[in-house]
């Protein structure tokens, strides 16, 4: 007897027992081990089938189909499945004489009825089941498929938690919502929206899909600010209450993930609430294109509801097979539209048929056996013995997973996670009278304006810079992406935490007048708030007891704990705080400096040496001697003042060199080269003298202050107490970053304690120095009568900002407003209003060593002078060698005469007179050289004339 007949025969009490026992059968988790062992036994027995003789094929094979007939998906799936069955049976190349028989069951949108329908299908010994369309029903009947080893191919269950590990016989032939949520996250990131509100149906598909979206957004530093769940089958009143509540929140970006049969009601209610106007962003998952595609014609009223909505639709590759199927659809369902789930259902049937064809060609047979687990339910009135295990189910499932062919939806192939390969979505913008394609998404290339299949041949590239979409028109006919958020209209003001300071109250402090606080930081915040394009109701809340400065780290933690929406004050932007809150653009520069007592430096008898560094003195002195030697070489042959005994010439070189320092040299330069070198050198001396005079004047006239502490390095190594301000980050920085012992750090309450601790010093219970931020020190030094100064350099660089909760959009708008205040000069005006301090003395000690003139300031002058000397020396020696060459014949005759008188002289000795002659030529006066050359030329002329006369006389005698 059939299953339904059995239910009709029992009484009402027995019917209740039937339901309970059915559910117990479905959720038999403890029986999993037995199922596994039975699975292995059946698979091992079937593995030997290849060794057996060829089996006779059955005349027909039963396949189940389970979905809701009266639904957008079901109305498209049923004719598609029937058409696929007819096509398979008509195709002689597939199954070859075996009739494919599909048994239909209506789940009627009910998990219970769907489960009953699945059990009825199993009674008919089906080898596979196609469906269901609902993820919730798929979860339930997957347990049945696991127990009976029947592959379950769903063309509509997109829930990403339907895992192959939990349900090894479940296979999704459509796209996984895991990829759709990645596509939506990429679109949100592309548009710059960091907070969204998710509106979803409260079932497995809705909850789990939105959960995946939240995880993906978290990786992109975005988040779902609120999850608004809709009860399945909710009426308009419930939806209205939900939308009214989310409309009071700050986010204006809504992701709608509901069922296609009731989803349009969400937009109808939103339209009536004015939530489809400019400033709103609506993003719908594939349910909306499914609903619209299922309509033969989308009427104008429906399109009016959806103006500006962005939707994602399953992308299927355009092909001739797809076009033929779409043309055929008009004959199958002339009054209904065509959606993607019809194609997935059609391909699912063909997938089963092709897998069966491979199954039979491998000489496998279809056999069923009783499940021993079902016989343990003694006393049950349900005929569970009618349910049989498909013995070859595991092998058949492996064949299905290994299939690789092309269907109506494109290539049908599965990856290691049993998902369709190359998932892709079409991005639609609903505007005007029909949806418009603005781009595509795939896990291979992200957002793109070209078809995904054209990019598969290229390397994967999902970088942010590679993302592209066409222009989108948002609700209200807005072409620019909306900001995506507004200040929440829930009647709650912005909670602003303000430190209740007791020191440096010009920055921030308590005030008796509204709004209860005052100071530089408050004025900056108020000025920035006024620049925002929307009103921000706010209330200031003091933090601290008013006796000591509060801990700023604790104040930031209050923002993290949602006790404050923002912390406003002199809050330093440091790395540790940025991990938990979002800071605005800094509105004032800051950094840690060291303040120490100073005293006037004693005058030194060697102060005249301080203008130059040691290297500068050495190079300058060397150049004085070098230039003096160069001038002596160039003038020695021309100028009598540079000639004489060696002692006199050496004195002349030193005297001339250093007398040029004061431009008082009495020796005149005669040669052109000497004058050229001297002019360049006097210019260098002029620059050096002027710089020396200016530097020495500064050193002797400006008050010189000294301190035992020279900067943060000497302070760290001194082992003396260090003062810090209560509540600031300076203490943690010194301990954690500079490894200073906590016992050395002395917290100070206010300016009076600062000055008192510095005056007493470390030996009298005070401190050696204070480490604090520069803005505070500027105020402190105005009241110190120049007794204290900053020493060393600022050793951190940071600023003050306002601390907002993580991912708060208000932080971005406030940063923009602060930049605008800076560009317009308003920040400077506020600074002058509160912090216009005039310092009678310099804040920092001027170190004489830092003001010394070094060689790097003058090396260019010395280089020019050196090049000039080298050029002059080159020209000089070239002239000397030229003159020597002209005197060379006379010297050669004398050398040969010497060789006759001293035949035993060596080769080295024979070359010596030439060098001596060269030295003699260099040492001779220029006038003497010219006279010798003149005489030599005259002798040569006379000898030429004598030779000519002798030649003429000889010619006469011959004649």
From Swiss-Prot:
Which residues does UniProt assign to the signal peptide? 1-35
The residues that the database entry marks as glycosylated are 38, 42, 108, 365, 378, 404, 443, 461, 576
Its keywords, alphabetically, are: Cell membrane, Chloroplast, Glycoprotein, Ion channel, Ion transport, Ligand-gated ion channel, Membrane, Plastid, Receptor, Signal, Stress response, Transmembrane, Transmembrane helix, Transport
Principal localisation: membrane
UniProt KW Nucleus keyword = no
**Reported phenotype of the disruption mutant:** Impaired glutamate-triggered (and Ala, Asn, Cys, Gly, Ser-triggered) membrane depolarization and calcium rise. Slight reduction of photosynthetic yield of Photosystem II. Overproduction and aberrant placement of lateral root primordia.
Q: Name one GO biological process term.
A: cellular response to mechanical stimulus
Q: A Pfam family this protein belongs to? A: Lig_chan
Q: Does the keyword rRNA-binding apply?
A: no
Tissue specificity = Highly expressed in roots and at lower levels in leaves and siliques. Expressed in seedlings, cotyledons, roots (e.g. root hairs, epidermis and cortex cells), stems, leaves (e.g. vascular bundles and hydathodes), and siliques. Expressed in root phloem.
Q: Give the UniProt entry's GO cellular component terms.
A: chloroplast; chloroplast membrane; plasma membrane; plastid
Q: Which compartments does it reside in? A: Cell membrane; Plastid, Chloroplast membrane
According to its UniProt record, which protein family does this protein belong to?
Belongs to the glutamate-gated ion channel (TC 1.A.10.1) family.
Described function: Glutamate-gated receptor that probably acts as a non-selective cation channel, at least in hypocotyls. Can be triggered by Asn, Ser, Gly and, to a lower extent, Ala, Cys and Glu. May be involved in light-signal transduction and calcium homeostasis via the regulation of calcium influx into cells. Plays an important role in the calcium-based fast transmission of environmental stress. Acts as a negative regulator of lateral root initiation and development. May restrict primordia numbers and position along the root axis by a signaling process originating in the phloem.
Put simply, this protein is called Glutamate receptor 3.4
Its lineage reads: Eukaryota, Viridiplantae, Streptophyta, Embryophyta, Tracheophyta
């Amino acid at each position: 007897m059939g299953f339904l007949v059995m239910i009709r025969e029992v009484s009402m009490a027995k019917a209740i027992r039937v339901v309970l026992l059915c559910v117990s059968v479905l959720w038999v988790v403890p029986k999993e081990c037995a199922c596994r062992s039975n699975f292995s036994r059946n698979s091992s027995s079937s593995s030997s089938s290849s060794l057996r003789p060829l089996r006779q094929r059955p005349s027909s094979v039963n396949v189940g189909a389970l979905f809701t007939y009266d639904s957008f998906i079901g109305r498209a799936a049923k004719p598609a499945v029937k058409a696929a069955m007819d096509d398979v049976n008509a195709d002689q190349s597939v199954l070859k004489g075996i009739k494919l028989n599909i048994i239909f069951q209506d789940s009627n949108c009910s998990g219970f009825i769907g489960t009953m329908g699945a059990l009825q299908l199993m009674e008919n010994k089906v080898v596979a089941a196609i469906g269901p369309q609902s993820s919730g029903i798929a979860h339930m009947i997957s347990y049945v498929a696991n127990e009976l080893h029947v592959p379950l191919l769903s063309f509509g269950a997109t829930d990403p938690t339907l895992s192959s590990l939990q349900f090894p016989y479940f296979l999704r032939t459509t796209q996984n919502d895991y990829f759709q949520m990645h596509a939506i996250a990429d679109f949100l990131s592309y548009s710059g929206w960091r907070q969204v509100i998710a509106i979803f149906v409260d079932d497995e598909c809705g909850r789990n899909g939105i959960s995946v979206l939240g995880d993906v957004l978290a990786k992109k530093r975005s988040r779902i600010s609120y999850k608004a769940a809709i009860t399945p089958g909710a009426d308009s009143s419930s939806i209205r209450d939900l939308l009214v509540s989310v409309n009071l929140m700050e986010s204006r970006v809504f992701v709608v993930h509901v069922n296609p049969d009731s989803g349009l009601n969400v937009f109808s209610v939103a339209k009536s609430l004015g939530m489809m106007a400019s400033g709103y962003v609506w993003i719908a998952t594939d349910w909306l294109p499914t609903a619209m595609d299922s309509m033969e014609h989308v009427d104008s009223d429906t399109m009016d509801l959806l103006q500006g909505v962005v939707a994602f639709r399953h992308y299927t590759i355009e092909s001739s097979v797809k076009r033929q199927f779409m043309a055929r659809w008009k004959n199958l369902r002339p009054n209904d539209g065509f959606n993607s789930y019809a194609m997935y259902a059609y391909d699912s049937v063909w997938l089963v048929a092709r897998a069966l064809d491979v199954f039979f060609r491998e000489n496998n047979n279809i056999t069923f056996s009783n499940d021993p687990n079902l016989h343990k339910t003694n006393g049950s009135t349900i005929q569970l013995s009618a349910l049989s295990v498909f013995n070859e189910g595991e092998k058949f499932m492996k064949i299905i997973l290994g299939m690789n062919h092309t269907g109506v939806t494109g290539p049908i192939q599965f990856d290691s996670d049993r998902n369709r390969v190359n998932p892709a979505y079409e991005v639609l913008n609903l505007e005007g009278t029909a949806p418009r394609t603005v781009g595509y998404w795939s896990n291979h290339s992200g957002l793109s304006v070209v078809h995904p299949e054209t990019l598969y041949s290229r390397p994967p590239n999902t970088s942010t810079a590679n993302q592209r979409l066409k222009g989108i028109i948002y609700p209200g006919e807005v072409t620019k992406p909306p900001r995506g958020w507004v200040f929440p209209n829930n009647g709650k003001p912005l909670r602003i935490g303000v430190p209740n300071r007791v020191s440096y109250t010009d920055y921030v402090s308590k005030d008796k007048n509204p709004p209860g606080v005052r100071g530089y930081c408050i004025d900056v915040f108020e000025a920035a708030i006024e620049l925002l394009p929307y009103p921000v109701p706010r209330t200031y809340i003091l933090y601290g007891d008013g006796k000591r400065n509060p801990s700023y780290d604790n104040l930031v933690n209050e923002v993290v704990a949602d006790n404050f929406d923002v912390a406003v004050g002199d809050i330093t932007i440091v790395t540790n705080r940025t991990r938990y809150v979002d800071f605005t653009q800094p509105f004032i520069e800051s950094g840690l400096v060291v303040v120490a007592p100073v005293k006037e430096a004693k005058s030194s008898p060697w102060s005249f040496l301080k203008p130059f560094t040691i290297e500068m003195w050495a190079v300058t002195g060397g150049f004085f001697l070098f230039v003096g030697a160069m001038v002596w070489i160039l003038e020695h042959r021309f100028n009598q003042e540079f000639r004489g005994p060696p002692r006199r010439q050496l004195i002349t070189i030193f005297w001339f060199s250093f007398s040029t320092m004061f431009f008082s040299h009495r020796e005149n330069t005669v040669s052109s080269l000497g004058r050229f070198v001297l002019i360049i050198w006097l210019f260098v001396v002029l620059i050096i003298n002027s710089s020396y005079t200016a530097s020495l004047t500064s050193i002797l006239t400006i008050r010189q202050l000294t301190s035992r502490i020279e900067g943060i390095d000497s302070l760290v190594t001194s082992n003396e107490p260090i003062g810090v301000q209560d509540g600031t980050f300076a203490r943690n920085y010194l301990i954690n970053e500079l490894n200073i012992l906590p016992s050395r750090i002395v917290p100070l309450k206010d300016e009076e304690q600062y000055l008192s601790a510095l005056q007493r010093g470390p030996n009298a219970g005070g401190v050696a120095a204070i480490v604090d931020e520069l803005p505070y020190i500027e105020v402190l030094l105005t009241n110190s009568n120049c007794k204290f100064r900053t020493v060393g350099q600022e050793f951190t660089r940071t600023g003050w900002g306002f601390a907002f909760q993580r991912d708060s959009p208000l932080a971005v708008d406030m940063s923009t407003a602060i930049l605008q205040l800076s560009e317009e000069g308003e920040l400077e005006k506020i600074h002058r209003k509160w912090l216009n301090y005039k310092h009678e003395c310099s804040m920092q000690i001027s170190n004489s060593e830092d003001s010394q003139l070094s060689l790097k300031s003058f090396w260019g002058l010395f280089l020019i002078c050196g090049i000039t000397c080298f050029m002059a020396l080159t020209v000089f020696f070239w002239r000397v060698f030229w003159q020597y060459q002209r005197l060379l014949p006379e010297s050669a005759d004398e050398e040969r005469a010497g060789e006759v008188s001293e035949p035993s002289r060596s080769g080295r000795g024979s070359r010596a007179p030439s060098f001596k002659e060269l030295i003699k030529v260099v040492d001779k006066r220029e006038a003497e050289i010219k006279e010798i050359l003149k005489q030599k030329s005259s002798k040569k002329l006379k000898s030429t004339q004598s030779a000519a006369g002798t030649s003429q006389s000889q010619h006469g005698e011959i004649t």
